[in-house]
Amino acid sequence: MSIINNTYQINIPGSYMFEEYQSTLLGLWVILTTILFQAMVAIRFHRGQKGGYKVGIIKPELGQSSIVFRSHRTFHNSLENIIPFFGMVVLGVLSEYSASKLALVTWIYAITRIIHMVLYYKIVTEKNPSPRSLFWAIGFITNIYLLVDLGIHLIIKL
């Protein structure tokens, strides 16, 4: 059996997954692109701060009023949150979890992370909760939902 069919498409065993989970994979790409964008924003503001900068060190006196602080926190918050989500999405794809559910959860997470990012850049407040907290919470609840529902799916498949 050839892996290239007569329409010049590559046929790889299990490649149906890529079609079935295309929306999920695109959502993951958006999430990872958002995080890369956040890294570039944080680098730009960090290197542009007055008084110079030291690689990887944020001045301890900086707070919410500093875009250097907020861009750094936005990026690190995304890094903290992507690890469990990304792992669960990969497990979902490999275990043939519902493609439509996984796509919906991934896009909810992607959109809430983008809104959270924009609000974190724009809102200068020490108050908690703030409007950005709502979108952090939606992303966190999305993680919890996927953790529980995927766990049930994996247990049922035993």
Where are the language model's segments positioned?
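Short, strongly hydrophobic alpha-helical membrane anchors
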Residues: 1-21, 157
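N-terminal signal-anchor transmembrane alpha helix
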Residues: 18-58
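Core segments of transmembrane alpha-helices
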Residues: 34, 76-91
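Alpha-helical transmembrane segments of multipass membrane proteins
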Residues: 34-42, 84, 112, 116, ...
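Short alpha-helical packing/oligomerization segments
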Residues: 91-111
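Interfacial loop-to-transmembrane junctions
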Residues: 115-142
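Juxtamembrane boundary at the C-terminal end of a transmembrane helix
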Residues: 147-158
